[in-house]
Amino acid sequence: MSGLPTARPAVFSVPPYVGGESRLDGVNRVIKLSSNEGAFGPPPGAIAALTEVAAIAHRYPDGGATSLRAAIGRRFCLDPARIVCGNGSDDLIALLIQSYGGPGTELVMSRHGFLIYEIAARLAGMNVRKAPERNLTADIDAMLAEVTPATRLVFLANPNNPTGSLVPASDVSRLRAELPPDVLLVLDAAYAEYVERADYDPGVELVDSGQNTVMTRTFSKMFGLGGVRLGWAYAPLAIVDVLNRTRMPFNVSGPAAAAGIAALAEPGWVERCRNHNTRARTELAARIERAGFRVWPSEANFLLADLETADRAAAADTHLRSRGIIVRQVAAYGLPQCLRITIGTDEECSTVADALDDFGQNHG
């Protein structure tokens, strides 16, 4: 024996998650387009709420996030009793995996799905089965083919990060219909507020019509609250009961809850941000394509630019950094030839487009 505390082997089966960078050495003004944060920051009402609640930061928050759940219910016409809030949606994702997975069981996801699913699953001792995709979009038939008697959870990010692709509601419904009833389907709709397609459903209808589906959402993107960490899940009552047993007692801070309630009440915020995102995304995609690079279709607040080779993507990233611009390399997702670029303000989008145009002319 070593005489030292020993962690479970599963802890060392995954590398630590690395988020988008925020700083560059020697650069005072950084344009951060690496974490899919909202272009305009938090709504003014949320900022005011954070300031106001600071005076009572010594008080423990409501452990059940009652007022926040009621506000979410009002905004999205949902039953607050079927809502669970957490310290970001990844908190709830990890709780679902801990609660329904375990050693020897399996989680199914698409090939380029969100990394947190695999990390949390492996930490829980699960095996991860990744289904091949079609044109960087989840292939429902391929996902169903990966399901075995050991499968306990199926995760689908819709729209997906980092590709931005979307699976129509009819296909998601078919996925659920063909899963065994004891397999939990988790629909991660972190980017739902950005979608304008009529054939999209974030998961509400499937949660309402069955007992094995959960929808997760976040305040980190459209509502600009990534720094306070706030997410929520909509689920059948039996799953809500499980999450309330496994989550920590105060997993939503008072400031986070106050900011979330205020953000939901901000008049016109979602419409303003969505309209900007749709227009700016279209314009930036066109400029990147004119610079000579492929851009994959996106329904989220980011674009995936294809530089064809890993070396070229790395060179482009270095060039952008020299201009004070941080985007996201996505080699960890199996896409070393790509860069993920958040849709920022008009000025930020113009700056990154100019830099990529210059790279294309001088390094193409």
Curated annotation (Swiss-Prot):
Cofactor dependency: pyridoxal 5'-phosphate
Coiled coil segments of this chain: none
A single BP term in Gene Ontology: L-histidine biosynthetic process
Pfam families per record: Aminotran_1_2
Sequence positions bearing N6-(pyridoxal phosphate)lysine: K221
Subunit structure, as described in the record: Homodimer.
Record's protein name: Histidinol-phosphate aminotransferase
Species this chain originates from: Acidiphilium cryptum (strain JF-5)
